[in-house]
Amino acid sequence: LRVDANNHTVTMLVQINGRFLTDDTRHGIVFKDGSNGHKSLFMAYATPKAFYEALKEAGGTPGENMTMDNKETTHVTGSKLDISVNWQGAAKAYSFDEVIVDSNGKKLDMRFGGNLTAAEEKKTGCLVCLDSCPVGIVSNATYTYGAVEKRGEVKFKGNASVLPADNTLATVTFKITE
């Protein structure tokens, strides 16, 4: 993980999981050794604790508003993040909206939710979830928990027309915008 406190950014190394260029997932980025490590579009080399601490060091404020009880009715809060993805040979750094397809065409609203205690208890390795989540360090305020798997309100997958092949290494940069 690379932290640039002056520019309020955190950059991490990830690997593309090509399965989710065709299959749906609610898992954006997960630590490769977590129990959900192979369920995400991007497999990361950073732990939830390291990622949480890096976002705080970069100036982020965790929302800490998500619980197991309120998750299906609550939208995650916390510092707003612009997320971009780059890799060797990429035409440019692509925004998260460009690399992740939302079946409803809605924009992602990525927030530093926090949730370090739950993350350490559950050991899923979840870093970035595509709906509001009480475990992931960062998640998407556009949808509440259960929107993908339980209620079928939306489907997410990687944008195969933009992203490189399975196993390609990439960097993901999180910029704190508010």
Walk through the language-model features, giving the residues of each.
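Long, low-hydrophobicity ectodomains and other hydrophilic envelope-associated domains
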Residues: 1-178
